[in-house]
Amino acid sequence: MTKIDHPRVVKNMSIPELKRLSAEIRRFLIEKLSKTGGHIGPNLGVVELTIALHREFDSPKDKLIWDVGHQSYVHKILTGRAAAFDTLRQYKGLSGFPKRSESEHDVWETGHSSTSLSAAMGMAIARDLKGTDEYIVPIIGDGALTGGMALEALNHIGHEKTDMIVILNDNEMSIAPNVGALHNILGRLRTAGKYQWVKDELELLLKRIPAVGGKLAATAERLKDSLKYLLVSGVFFEELGFTYLGPVDGHDFEDLFENLRYAKKMKGPVLVHVITKKGKGYSPAENDKVGTWHGTGPYKIETGAFVKTKEAGPSWSALVSETVRRLARTDPRIVAITPAMPVGSKLEGFASEFPDRMFDVGIAEQHATTLAAGLATQGMKPFLAIYSTFLQRAYDQVVHDVCRQNLNVFFAIDRAGLVGADGETHQGVFDIAFLRHVPNLVLMMPKDENEGQHMVYTAIRYDDGPIAMRFPRGNGLGVPLDEELKEIPIGTWEVLRDGCDAAILTFGTTISMALKAADELAKDGISVKVVNARFLKPMDVAMLHELLESRLPILTVEEAVLQGGFGSAVLEFAHDHGYHGAVIERMGIPDRFIEHGSVSELLNEIGLTSTHIIDRIKTMVPRKQKRA
């Protein structure tokens, strides 16, 4: 593997040699990812397809554009990056997604789904305007194809007759099993046999029908249309303006080469429908029916058992979903919605117990949000489980459809804050800034899982408009959980530790580092008040006035972007209420995208640890003698 420095090496290999290479790549991926973790299922499924693409096209002249990008590991191996796989998704190591700064062969950066077709069309138009002749080849999965943006692009590409070759990698799964009518169309295609062969035979048959006289000609045309729709599901893509080729066996080199070569000869947009097996070559991943092996942490190769880390408390995702499930037993209004993340959001239990009240809408965040809004207009209590990074995709729906109408939707914002190895495309650090200025919305974050379950209860009980609870990736702190759930008064903070020299206002994951900093500062005679600012909107106005009137230096700390964040809200409050002499400083995520690495490494890099808090407080508080 490490000897491959350019994809040209596969161009002169025989098919037996390519089969041996495929097996070697699979062994390499299984071994490396058992240590680093990563997206093993998608990559094991595209080994032959990726080799075939690099054999038939000339990267980087020809543009290979990977939708989502989590299936680009084989592409990285073939473009000379195998030696870096020990650092995959590690701090300062190889990215788990295509990265333009990493290789000239990575022409488009991804992480979110359904963007490849629009980007490819832009590249194709630029090619035509410049008069060059490279092939533009987006590779998109059947799950990503359900995204509205992909369908918009298909419509535009077909209308413009843009020259490009779309590879549809159909493995019947995105992360979890795919849903929806388009998935059903593709299912019919998988069993329809060779579309082009059927189409050619059909056209020969139709040519034999004598078109004599208006009535007979009309009959022949109706027959043509009827046969076309009866025999060929590929008409979906043909009606959009694409030439459809397939289905193609994505693990058969001869089938792949034949269809890719044919596609290269054609004008206009071509769609090559390739059938692959997610997880192929490693039985635990190959037999995965729910998406567990889509992306994993380290695992034991021999057994497929995941290497468990010592976690103190329950999974945050499980805590939230199971609390909602508990409440749904006595509240028939509760309906759960997820945009293709039932496993990640730990909604399997809810789906099993309440199948008629659980909706996996596929990769369709905009639809998921407005679906929730529609449910709310009819008195239901929609619970939308969505990752912070994916909520970005539904911003207009949050503003226009939910908050503007002041509808009772509960947004459970998972993976809020830094998420680590998935890197800059998945860090959940923007939601406070893009939500706190939207009217009618309540925004909160708990300090631990016990407060978290009470916040879920508060959100379900809240009937005065939309409410959002953000919570981090991973597990809780292991604190005891109260048996009885209780409502937390909206817009209230709590003092966790009193102090007379300075105050730290923080929430969520950064509370523990603030408390640790306060302990250390106390040893130096500096008394620091620590406030759990659990409601980011509305803020605790009474406590803010009290703090500002006390003239204590205030430090806000947040694991989110500083621009437009919680600290900005505190500064605005102080300014608007005339506290112009207040000493307020902020700590948080700087104005740049944060790359991959462990959360602790990233926090240290950006200066957001208890040590950094201690140093900042010492600059804000006059020197004091250490107390006896």
UniProtKB/Swiss-Prot annotation:
HAMAP family: DXP_synth
The reaction(s) this protein catalyses: D-glyceraldehyde 3-phosphate + pyruvate + H(+) = 1-deoxy-D-xylulose 5-phosphate + CO2
Record's cofactor remark: Binds 1 Mg(2+) ion per subunit. Binds 1 thiamine pyrophosphate per subunit.
Function recorded in the entry: Catalyzes the acyloin condensation reaction between C atoms 2 and 3 of pyruvate and glyceraldehyde 3-phosphate to yield 1-deoxy-D-xylulose-5-phosphate (DXP).
EC number: 2.2.1.7
Pathway: Metabolic intermediate biosynthesis; 1-deoxy-D-xylulose 5-phosphate biosynthesis; 1-deoxy-D-xylulose 5-phosphate from D-glyceraldehyde 3-phosphate and pyruvate: step 1/1
Enzyme class: transferase
Matching Gene3D superfamilies: 3.40.50.920, 3.40.50.970
Any one GO biological process: terpenoid biosynthetic process
GO cellular component: cytosol
One Pfam family this sequence matches: DXP_synthase_N
PANTHER family tied to this protein: 1-D-DEOXYXYLULOSE 5-PHOSPHATE SYNTHASE-RELATED, 1-DEOXY-D-XYLULOSE-5-PHOSPHATE SYNTHASE, CHLOROPLASTIC
Keyword annotations: Isoprene biosynthesis, Magnesium, Metal-binding, Thiamine biosynthesis, Thiamine pyrophosphate, Transferase
Domain of life, source organism: Bacteria
Required cofactor(s): Mg(2+); thiamine diphosphate
Protein name, entry field: 1-deoxy-D-xylulose-5-phosphate synthase
Subunit description: Homodimer.
InterPro entries: Dxylulose-5-P_synthase, THDP-binding, Transketo_C/PFOR_II, Transketolase-like_Pyr-bd, Transketolase_BS, Transketolase_C, Transketolase_CS
An MF annotation (GO) of this entry: thiamine pyrophosphate binding
Binding site for thiamine diphosphate: H70, G111, H112, S113, G143, A144, N171, Y282, E365
Annotated positions binding Mg(2+): D142, N171
